[in-house]
Regions:
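Phosphate-binding P-loop/Walker A region and its immediate neighborhood
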Residues: 2-4, 101, 114-124, 137, ...
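N-proximal, solvent-exposed amphipathic alpha-helical segments enriched in charged/polar residues
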Residues: 82-127
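Short edge beta-strands and adjacent turn/loop segments
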Residues: 117-141, 329-330
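Short beta-alpha junctions and helix-cap segments that line functional grooves
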Residues: 158-159, 174-175, 201-203, 376, ...
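Glycine/charge-rich, flexible interdomain linkers and switch-proximal surface loops
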Residues: 177-190, 319-330, 376-378
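Conserved C-terminal "switch" segment of AAA+ ATPases
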Residues: 412-428
Length: 470
């Protein structure tokens, strides 16, 4: 009898002890979450409790009021330093824990990104390691260590579900070798805010600015807030996008970036506008040649090809790379609609254009001839030339297959969804550069008619300036 009552008493004590443990555990979790969500209030309450225990209630209230007044004065009077030292670090830690680390196991399990333990069906599955989290103003970067047996394609197939789980606008999966230094790592770019939603005014070059570097021509901004620059020297650039997607923004941003070199006579832009010249006529004073009808376009093509072949003959065996001078400037062939070049009714003209275009793309890079071409409707003919363009920019498109045609299938799998770009954001797109497997999201400058007129007035080539002075 006594043994039964003793066992009953021990069971009651065990139950009460477990209850206390659960209460303390839940209280601790609640306080931790409270501190994460309202760090200022939690800090003041902690100060009040400690002061009350050490000095009494009166001093606790006084100290709390003084601290609260000091914090609010700091926050209102010096918001930048408060955000840098207190606000941003706390918000970053809170987002890291609440959005990513706390739910990481559950999110991976729900999306089939865990692997069962061999021979232990009832054990917890293996979960990919979330090795690093970096919070950004618009894009968070997560470095994930893949499990043995996983590949980036497993994750790329789940980007839509992961975006919904993180409460993000989109998720892009990219190889993490360059960033993390390990081949089994991938990088998740979680975009929770669109930093490219608003138009970006053109950063006008100064009329007396130094000559532009052809290896770094600024044309816009990346979604991380850094300048978006394209390499023109030794490269060809292909720009694809639907009507109103912002192809003109990219082309005019490139012209604006090249303007100091145009004025110095080191860059000669030859513009071909097969659609009748409406888009680029306002900037004609900037161009070395401007053609918009079949006859004049063919004339420019032939002259440029002759110049290219003559340069190649002269530089062969002397140098591997052309250096622009006023006597031999770097030639930029600007084509507003690539597909229209081959749309002439005359079969002989079409064959000649195809031949000349192939020569430029194959031989022009080494002798100072760069092709910058825009295309509206990617076709099989354009896809055949795609590999000859080291830099490709995909703006808003109407179909999924067009993204793969302009960029690549791998770029689409990484999250370059050109067909999902809103029609209200012209100039937004994805850029893929030869030698870099990662796709970047960017937006070109918004170039107005006033900007074009200003460029045309201040950056004429030397030949036009001398002709005007005469």
């Amino acid at each position: 009898m006594s043994s039964n009552s003793k066992s009953k008493k021990e069971a009651e004590e065990d139950w009460f002890g477990e209850l206390l443990v659960d209460v303390f555990r839940l209280t601790g979790k609640g306080l931790f979450r409270f501190a994460l969500r309202w760090p200022d209030t939690a800090t003041l309450l902690s100060i009040s409790v400690v002061a009350g225990m050490l000095a009494g209630l009166r001093w606790a209230w006084l100290l709390t009021v003084v601290c609260a007044a000091g914090v609010w004065a700091w926050r209102l009077g010096w918001p930048d330093s408060y955000a840098r030292l207190i606000g941003n670090p706390v918000a970053d830690y809170r987002r890291t824990y609440l959005v990513y680390r706390r739910r990481w196991r559950t999110i991976c399990d729900r999306h089939g990104l865990t692997i069962p333990r061999r021979g232990k069906p009832d054990a917890e599955p293996l979960v990919p390691e979330l090795s690093a989290v970096r919070i950004g103003s618009a894009v968070d970067t997560l470095v994930v260590r893949l499990l043995v047996g996983q590949s980036p394609k497993n994750w790329q197939a789940q980007v839509d579900g992961l975006a919904a789980a993180f409460g993000a606008q989109s998720v892009a999966i990219q190889p993490g070798r360059a960033e993390a230094g390990r081949g089994r790592d991938i990088v998740l770019r979680v975009r929770h805010h669109d930093a490219l939603a608003d138009p970006i005014p053109l950063a006008r070059p100064e009329p007396d600015s130094p000559v532009v570097r052809l290896a770094h021509v600024r044309v816009g901004v990346t979604e991380h807030g850094s300048p978006w620059a394209l390499r023109v020297s030794g490269h060809h650039i292909l720009i694809g996008g639907a009507t109103g997607a912002g192809k003109g923004s990219v082309l005019w941003s490139l012209v604006a970036g090249l303007a100091p070199g145009i004025k110095a006579g080191l860059i000669a832009v030859r513009c071909l506008d097969p659609k009748g010249g409406m888009e680029f006529a306002a900037g004609a004073p900037l161009f070395d040649r401007f053609a918009y009808d079949p006859e004049s376009i063919l004339e420019v093509l032939r002259d440029t090809t002759a110049t290219m072949l003559a340069r190649a003959q002269r530089l062969r065996g002397t140098t591997r790379c052309h250096r622009p001078t006023r006597a031999e400037p770097h030639i930029v062939l600007l084509v507003d609609e690539l597909a229209t070049l081959t749309a002439y009714a005359d079969r002989k003209q079409r064959a000649e254009v195809d031949q000349l275009l192939g020569l430029w793309l194959a031989q022009g890079r080494a002798v100072g001839v760069s092709v910058i071409a825009a295309v509206q409707d990617p076709s099989k003919d354009v896809v055949a030339l795609r590999q000859l363009f080291p830099v490709r920019v995909g703006l808003r498109m109407t179909e999924t297959t067009q993204t793969a045609m302009i960029l690549s299938t791998a770029a689409y799998q990484q999250g370059a969804r050109c067909e999902e770009i809103p029609a209200t954001t012209p100039g937004v797109g994805y850029v893929l550069t030869e030698g870099n497997s990662s796709v970047g999201r960017v937006r070109a400058f918004h170039v107005t008619d006033t900007d074009i007129a200003w460029l045309a007035a201040h950056f004429n080539p030397p030949a036009r300036r001398s002709a005007r002075s005469r």
